Curated annotation (Swiss-Prot):
Stored Pfam families: TPR_12
Protein name: Protein FLUORESCENT IN BLUE LIGHT, chloroplastic
GO CC terms in record: chloroplast membrane; chloroplast thylakoid membrane
TPR repeat start-end pairs: 203-236, 243-276, 283-316
Swiss-Prot/TrEMBL GO biological process terms: chlorophyll biosynthetic process
UniProt entry keywords in alphabetical sequence: Chloroplast, Coiled coil, Membrane, Plastid, Repeat, Thylakoid, TPR repeat, Transit peptide, Transmembrane, Transmembrane helix
InterPro entries in alphabetical order: FLU, TPR-like_helical_dom_sf
SUPFAM superfamilies, alphabetized: TPR-like
Coiled-coil features, chain-numbered ranges: 144-175
Consequences of knocking out this gene: Loss of ability to restrict the accumulation of protochloro-phyllide (Pchlide) and delta-amin-olevulinic acid (ALA) in the dark, leading to a strong Pchlide fluorescence in etiolated mutant seedlings exposed to blue light. Rapid bleaching and death of plants transferred from the dark to the light, mediated by singlet oxygen production and enzymatic peroxidation of linolenic acid.
Organism placement in taxonomy: Eukaryota, Viridiplantae, Streptophyta, Embryophyta, Tracheophyta
Transit peptide location: 1-26
Organism: Arabidopsis thaliana
Amino acid sequence: MAALIRCCSSFSHTSGGQPPPRDKSRAPEIGKFATSIGYSVVRKPGDHPPFSKIIHSSSQPKERQGKGILQTPFASVGSLDKFSAFEGIGRLKLPVMAVLLTNSLQMATPLEALAAEICEPESSMFSMPILLLVALIGATVGGLLARQRKGELQRLNEQLRQINAALRRQAKIESYAPSLSYAPVGARIPDSEIIVEPKKQELISKLKTGKTFLRNQEPEKAYTEFKIALELAQSLKDPTEEKKAARGLGASLQRQGKYREAIQYHSMVLAISKRESEDSGITEAYGAIADCYTELGDLEKAGKFYDTYIARLETD
């Protein structure tokens, strides 16, 4: 409200100049209008520019005539007189204008609030089914995955218990006759009389060195030794030593945490055994591959290899 009246004051200052000509024919009507709202208009002829004193007609006109100019906190009466279209027209009290503008604002504001209240439920009603559908799908998928994971873990634990039981049985059997030898009776040939090729001797040396490094928890050095041994075994076309070198490479990579590369070398052991129709070392290869898949989190493949490993432990 204060902002509107200030704008009016500034407009009156900028308009300036002489007041518009007075319409004498409407003077009686102006007097009646001023008297009806409880104010009288007093004109001082000597002042320039002309202004009006607004004096209340119902209470002590003489006392108010001396100090009867209407005081307002917004703008001077002289500046408001310049803005008036007719000289000498009395003004309504400012609180009356404030009440009118306030009522108009109050009539407009509730409509906007009502429109906002009407729009909000529509958007929320449209969005709630979508949110509920997304939450329902997420809960369903999460429950299925958790149930599947739980079943795989239970199956894996059962397989590990079977492996431990088979290993304990095998250890008991071996403890009955630890010094029993199934080699034929005969004189042992001294090592000095055994003729070994230089490459074969180097191959055996690399395999022993690699095992020593594995035993000493040095898998990087063991990998280097087993790699050379594998190349020598392949050049000599010795499948038995080739499987030993491949098994050593898989073990060294497995201890370094390189499980996918380790699976490749353990699978090489299985391929050589299948090619040569010779089963030595494949039981350990199945168990090592299952361990690698377990570390990678692929429990389904790990379970398959554990099943094969358990079956071979029970038949060996």
